[in-house]
Amino acid sequence: MSERRRSAVALSSRAHAFSVEALIGSNKKRKLRDWEEKGLDLSMEALSPAGPLGDTDDPATHGLEPHPDSEQSTGSDSEVLTERTSCSFSTHTDLASGAAGPVPAAMSSMEEIQVELQCADLWKRFHDIGTEMIITKAGRRMFPAMRVKITGLDPHQQYYIAMDIVPVDNKRYRYVYHSSKWMVAGNADSPVPPRVYIHPDSLASGDTWMRQVVSFDKLKLTNNELDDQGHIILHSMHKYQPRVHVIRKDFSSDLSPTKPVPVGDGVKTFNFPETVFTTVTAYQNQQITRLKIDRNPFAKGFRDSGRNRTGLEAIMETYAFWRPPVRTLTFEDFTTMQKQQGGSTGTSPTTSSTGTPSPSASSHLLSPSCSPPTFHLAPNTFNVGCRESQLCNLNLSDYPPCARSNMAALQSYPGLSDSGYNRLQSGTASATQPSETFMPQRTPSLISGIPTPPSLPSNSKMEAYGGQLGSFPTSQFQYVMQAGNAASSSSSPHMFGGSHMQQSSYNAFSLHNPYNLYGYNFPTSPRLAASPEKLSASQSTLLCSSPSNGAFGERQYLPTGMEHSMHMISPSTNNQQATNTCDGRQYGAVPGSASQMSVHMV
């Protein structure tokens, strides 16, 4: 027996390979090896996006193959298991390289993002001069505002768009007026708390951002370091650079309006050199001021032409009593209106092509509240021609109800009835040649009368007209246009003086409301003769103005109260200077050169 056992033990290597013990042991090792390979295949399929590793030629898979000499090894089962399950990847990053495949694609998408500045030409114009931005305690918006167009975003990815403003350098500046340049004035002030303006449309998809112009027009700049409104805090007289940030959603965890913009692979920042600006509390460069007024649609109030007027014209615009309250129409105005109406064939710009008066055409001469005039004197009253007869011959049917009621009220006065005008016309001399009609614009309101003047000389053409005014109560005498000739320069220049009947030009009157009487005279060859002004202490405050061009004289009475009576309209003789006249100066006309005008009562 012992010999047999020794013989079995002493079997050769070839015989041992075919023994029962060897066959049973090799089957167990083969099954264990197959199970290990299947488990590794399943785990690698889950890690690799390209499919099963068996379909690829990745050399790493060769590390899973058993060693060629493994079948001949006689190691233990634990050694075989350790050898077969060990991963051939050298590091953890190599193992995760297959799973991190999309990361390079995301990084490449961030690199493809482009931001284009809108209104770049306007920014360049400001930059060439030296852009300035106003900052206030309450906050001031930027002009030009930052507007950008973004391209290259992933349409399905979510992004934040933000903006911040950072200092260009650590210097403080001052503006030198004689050279119109910004110069360094010292070191910058202490840093301000960081502020980030997150666009109100955030968070949005890349497709949404790319379909619109991203505007930061609601961003405000302030110098209040304690601001709690979310405005960007800046120091005055410092240079700053706006920046636009595109932040992917997965990198926005640290994004906050009161913290600096996070830095990482999912954040891309853009800036534009032409958007550098200097903060100020008031514009230093006048060129910047003018450019902002011209280009900023919200600065239209500063584009008023009156702001640019200087000298006497600005003073006259400021104080209305330096000039007449309204402008007298001239022949150029009628010509312009006629051209605007398409070259009407009538004799007047207020006449239609058939020669019929058009109240609507003359409505621009009157108040918008009641366009047609309240009342007109008939043509040739006081023997004054009215070539523009349509201005004098408007019928009652041509007026709106508001004008008709006023006309009826006017006609109720006996002094303004048709018979009164007939008497005025009958007392005048023969008709003279017609002249041009001038119609000033006045503001109509309630009509009242004027005080009754004293009796006038019998030869006065104004006697009848003065008599018609007796039915009106006391009011103010606002405008008086007076005229005289060289022969009567020493006589009373008063409008009711008898010497006016020998003058070569006539006074015509227009009764306006409130409580106004207007007289106009247009001498052909005016000249100015100065004499002292005489006023009575008990009478109304008087202001007389004479245009320097001498076209006509204007006298304006500004009463201190309605209780003042108009005794200044007193009779005077031809050889006595009136003591209650507006002004001793008068406009004379060369004898024989008559200039007339019609009467327009409103």
Swiss-Prot record:
Keyword DNA-binding among record annotations: yes
Keywords associated with the record: DNA-binding, Nucleus, Phosphoprotein, Transcription, Transcription regulation
Compositionally biased intervals (Polar residues): 71-94
Pfam families, A to Z: T-box
Subcellular location, principal: nucleus
GO molecular function, one term: DNA-binding transcription repressor activity, RNA polymerase II-specific
Region Disordered: start-end pairs: 43-95, 338-369, 425-444
SMART domains attached to this UniProt entry: TBOX (SM00425)
Gene Ontology cellular-component terms listed: nucleus; RNA polymerase II transcription repressor complex
CDD domains for this protein: T-box_TBX15-like (cd20198)
GO biological process entries: embryonic cranial skeleton morphogenesis; embryonic skeletal system morphogenesis; negative regulation of transcription by RNA polymerase II; positive regulation of DNA-templated transcription
Subunit structure: Can form a heterodimer with TBX18.
PANTHER family, alphabetized: T-BOX PROTEIN-RELATED, T-BOX TRANSCRIPTION FACTOR TBX15
Name of protein: T-box transcription factor TBX15
Organism expressing this protein natively: Mus musculus (Mouse)
Gene: Tbx15
